[in-house]
């Protein structure tokens, strides 16, 4: 148990909800998971990476953003969803073009009960093959983690 990790995670939620109470669950959890790790780790979440690597090796990996966007009940958000959300946020923040798209998406979120836009639609409109790119990003992250390539 690490109180620092929990504090960083919960403070991220608190900050996000003070700015945007209608943030989609996947983005809320993805950002909290990304920022819960110590600053020296630069968003690298070894546990999530190991979990995703195991699913990837077993051929059971589903990184579809569209699937994550459909989950709105926190009780139905599973370990794989947290890990995939972290990966999406990590990838989005690693690329200036995607960071801009994420910021624009965040700014467009409604503050009322109206239907929120979907980031997957925005990425599709940008013409990016985000499913291929996120998978390649994961494979690169796995290759850089010596404990996962043995």
Residues covered by each model-derived region:
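Short alpha-helical functional segments enriched in proximate histidine and acidic residues
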Residues: 14-18
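Acidic/His/Gly-enriched intrinsically disordered linker/tail segments
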Residues: 1-2, 19-150
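A broadly conserved amphipathic alpha-helix scaffold signal in soluble, globular proteins
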Residues: 12-13, 33
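Short alpha-helix carrying the canonical HExxH Zn2+-binding catalytic motif
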Residues: 2-12
């Amino acid at each position: 148990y690490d109180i620092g990790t929990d504090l960083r995670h919960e403070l991220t939620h608190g900050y996000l909800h003070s700015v945007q109470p209608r943030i989609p669950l996947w983005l809320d959890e993805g950002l909290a998971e990304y920022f819960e790790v110590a600053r020296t780790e630069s968003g690298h979440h070894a546990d999530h990476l190991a979990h995703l690597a195991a699913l990837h090796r077993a051929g059971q990996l589903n990184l579809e953003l569209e699937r994550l966007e459909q989950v709105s009940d926190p009780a139905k958000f599973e370990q794989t969803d947290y890990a995939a959300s972290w990966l999406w946020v990590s990838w989005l923040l690693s690329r200036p073009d995607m960071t801009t798209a994420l910021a624009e998406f965040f700014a467009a979120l409604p503050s009322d009960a109206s239907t929120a836009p979907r980031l997957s639609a925005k990425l599709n409109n940008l013409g990016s093959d985000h499913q291929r790119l996120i998978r390649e990003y994961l494979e690169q992250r796995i290759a850089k983690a010596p404990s996962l390539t043995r």
